[in-house]
UniProtKB/Swiss-Prot annotation:
Keyword Phosphoprotein among UniProt keywords: yes
GO biological process, one term: regulation of transcription by RNA polymerase III
Molecular function, one GO term: protein kinase regulator activity
A single GO cellular-component term on record: UTP-C complex
Disulfide bond positions: none
Listed SUPFAM superfamilies: Casein kinase II beta subunit (SSF57798)
Span list, region Disordered: 226-285
Keywords: Phosphoprotein
Sequence ranges of Gly residues compositional bias: 273-285
Classification via InterPro entries: Casein_kin_II_reg-sub_N, Casein_kinase_II_beta-like, Casein_kinase_II_reg-sub
Biased composition (Low complexity): 260-272
Comp. bias (Acidic residues): 229-259
Protein name: Casein kinase II subunit beta-2
């Protein structure tokens, strides 16, 4: 509101939505089409959520003409922001709203993933709850599938309900090409170039579990989401190595069985010969 201190009240009312979108801390929001916000069907149930609902709606739609004191104006302004946020959560899951958020996502307006292995992948705002004043907004990375806190304190104060818990999932269903291929690359702790034993053992176990899961998915002909070329080649190499190891184990087992059978045969033959000699000795005596 400080941006409009020098402006007249009529100018302020005329540019409320423009002012709201351009205000510092509101970069995560997109501009809601006037046709959407003036359609009462899209606002169903919000009158019970917002104080001074009608005045707030009039302010958002630039028809506010109530002559009131500063305290009342500030209260209505706060209600208008809250109402805009609640409508925003509904708008961004529409075709037009998704398109606007897509444009902001391409420009990385929501920030980039701080995880090194994600290579500055764009983030997408999301809520952990659909209930207002419950949890602040978080940022979702589609590459590592994890969520992060906004860097700016202004953004961290935004209500997560203004984006909702379903938006980011709907977004990537509508734009499936934006879902990055899963990478098997991971950080391996080292000391002077050598892998840390405990961490290395954990990584080997995790890799074996992941590879086993991918083999099961491949047998079931289910898309795993991992890169195909190099990863499938790795799996094929692993399968070949396992087959070779199994063949070697079978050969060793067969050799052990044959050796055991030979030893048993030799022992039986030796026992027969010993018995014959003993019988011959008794006869001579």
């Amino acid at each position: 509101m400080d941006d409009f201190v020098s402006e007249s009240e009529s100018d302020y009312a005329s540019y409320w939505r423009d002012w709201f979108i351009s205000s510092r801390g509101n970069e995560y929001f997109c501009e809601i089409d006037e046709d959407y916000i003036t359609d009462r069907f899209n606002l169903t149930g919000l009158n019970t959520e917002v104080q001074y609902y009608q005045y707030a709606l009039d302010l958002i739609t630039d028809v506010f003409d109530l002559d009131c004191d500063d305290d009342m104006r500030e209260t209505i302004e706060k209600s208008a922001r809250h109402l805009y946020g609640l409508v925003h959560a509904r708008y961004i899951v529409t075709t037009r709203g998704l398109q606007k958020m897509f444009e902001k996502y391409k420009k990385a307006d929501f920030g980039k993933c701080p995880r090194v292995m994600c290579s500055s992948h764009p983030l997408l705002p999301m809520g952990l709850s659909d209930v207002p004043n419950s949890k602040p907004v978080k940022l979702y990375c589609a590459r590592c599938e994890d969520i992060y806190n906004p860097k700016s304190s202004r953004h961290a104060a935004i209500d997560g309900a203004y984006f909702g818990t379903s938006f980011h999932n709907i977004f990537f269903q509508v734009y499936p090409t934006l879902v990055p291929a899963k990478s098997v690359e991971r950080y391996i702790p080292r000391c002077y170039g050598f892998k840390v034993h405990a961490a290395a053992a954990l990584v080997r176990w995790q890799n074996s579990q992941r590879d086993e899961m991918r083999r099961r998915l491949r047998k079931l002909e289910v898309e795993s989401g991992f890169k195909d070329a190099e990863d499938e080649a790795e799996l094929d190499d692993d399968d070949e190595e396992e087959e070779e190891e199994e063949e070697e184990e079978e050969e060793l087992a067969a050799m052990d069985e044959a050796e055991g059978a030979q030893q048993q045969h030799a022992a039986a033959a030796a026992g027969t010969a010993t018995g014959g000699v003993a019988a011959g000795g008794e006869g001579v005596h």
